Amino acid sequence: MAKEVKINLRLSMRVREVLNDEAEVEDTRIGTVANRLLQEELGRMMAVGADRCVMKDTKEYRALIPHLEGSYVLPTELEINRHITTRLDDKNYPQVSLYFTKEQAEFMAGLVKKQRIRGTLYYDGSVKSYRYVIVGMLLKNPLFADFGLN
């Protein structure tokens, strides 16, 4: 089996509640549900290719508007940011361990570099945080349809 890349991430209470509700239905853990949803979304993203994965309301998005069918459109940076927690509170905001193949992590790194969101890259261009891509993928999943971002 290929070596996995582990990424730890804190999710907002609202995202955790949705994942927790689904985990209770499936009689499993939040991390298991999150990993399954992310694998589904990554499959969709990788199928269309990185050049057709865009964040809404960006110049890349506007360039694709005539041809959005067959693209993967993430919510806006502001919408995603509302569902990212930065509190270092393990009791209320415990980390979730997410697992990806090396190929998937490289694909996501390409998207992070393409998005150029402040705080996600180091000065040398390497990835500091995947949180906008990961939370964006979760919010895109039909399980989060009630958020009104799909």
Where are these regions (language model features)?
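Helix-turn-helix-like N-terminal two-helix hairpins of bacterial/phage DNA-binding regulators
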Residues: 1-40, 44
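Short amphipathic alpha-helix starts
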Residues: 3-20, 51, 55-63, 94-112
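Short, locally clustered residues in the helix-turn-helix/winged-helix DNA-binding domain
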Residues: 23, 112, 139
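Short, basic amphipathic alpha-helical segments that act as recognition/interaction helices
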Residues: 26-53, 118-150
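Short, positively charged interaction helices/loops
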Residues: 43-95, 142-150
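Short amphipathic alpha-helical segments that mediate assembly, nucleic-acid/protein binding
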Residues: 60-61, 76-81, 102-105, 109, ...
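Assembly/interface hotspot detector across virion components, adhesins/toxins, and nucleic-acid enzymes
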Residues: 83-86, 114, 119-121
